[in-house]
Amino acid sequence: MELKIKALSPKIGTEIPFPRFATAGAACMDLCACIDEAVTLAAGERRLVPTGIAIALPSADYAALVFARSGLGIKKGVCLSNGVGVIDSDYRGEIGVGLVNLGGEPYTVQPGDRIAQLMVVPVVQPTVTVAEDLDETDRGAGGFGSTGR
């Protein structure tokens, strides 16, 4: 499978690296902040940070997911404002990363900082059938902790 990545800024590939897998076992590629100057997020503040890239997934059989970087969330309280970003196969615009500072201190994003992770995943578009009844299961309608601790 080929993922095409287009640089939308002259900084990409020079000052800011193209997304790549850091190790042979990596599931995600890092996305970097493509900004001209540092951006500070106050505690509780949200900001859309550009990456300077667009991608082309080969077909509707694939989507790209944008996840928070674990270190930012654990160490600084900086997460994605929408939980997980979904990039559909037909989207060709710039990838933007919505960040929110849930920590108690301001957090500064520097140009080129790794701010999120991109994962390409297979997609199944099922045939949707409206049903009067659903098959019974042992679990039934139990949710929100119903299967134990």
Segments and roles (model prediction):
Residues 1-149:
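DUTPase catalytic domain/fold
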